[in-house]
Amino acid sequence: MQCSHLLSYREEAKRVLFGGSMFVPDIPSLQRWLELAWSKGFDVSGALHFDNRICGSKRWIGTTECAALLRSFGLKARIVDFAPKKSKSMYLSVPGSAIAPKVKSYGPMDRYVVKKGGSGKGKAVDSHSSNSSRISKGAVLMEWVWNYFSDNRLNVSSGVHMTNKGPLYFQHEGHSRTIVGIQRRLLGTTFTPQYNLLILDPADFTRAIEKALIEKRGWEGYLKRGAHTLTCPEYQMLYVDNGIADGEELEKLKTIDSHFVEF
């Protein structure tokens, strides 16, 4: 979805992404593009992890591989890690990982996650929970997402804020989803914010989601996820800044770094 959005809404991306082909390649072709990115020196440590070969395999890839692929075209892909404070030194000790000095800080995310199955899906109800630590962790991530989508708003209509911000690649425990928006309600006299992420999950059936959205019935069960569903110990996000890097800036993008946000 990141690539589809870039091709649809970013003029500068259309010219460089996948050789200016104007379409998203199939998986085998994406694997070849990733190997080409590695051969150009993007994410050297990540390439070594895969022995510089990914074509034809079914090996698990994640946020850093997506960043390497996008950066190889000059796109400014940024990674944000959400994790407990005790994990911070571990992230920074990983070759190629560092606190990005100029990454815009919207709020809370994770770099190397446990590579195991799990859809991360949760029941679509409001974010109430007796587990205060879980809600606190979720609130940090939710606030980051809210601030991200609130930046550079285009217009407001009936309480809906339109933005030109791209979707967020959302990684956790071997599964990736796409955050396309966020809801906020202000509760009580203290106007306490309550959030729900709007998430597209590749594990869901596209036709079912499309039907629910057209009929405006049942779509919440597919898209809405409250803070109580954020139960993983770590999370990772990727977004793409505007502009195309070249020269020295492009060389710096070869090293995959991340902005660490503490839960």
Model regions and ranges:
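Active-site-adjacent substructure of cysteine-protease-like catalytic cores
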Residues: 71-200
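Active-site nucleophile-adjacent alpha helix/oxyanion-hole segment immediately C-terminal to the catalytic cysteine
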Residues: 1-57, 67-72
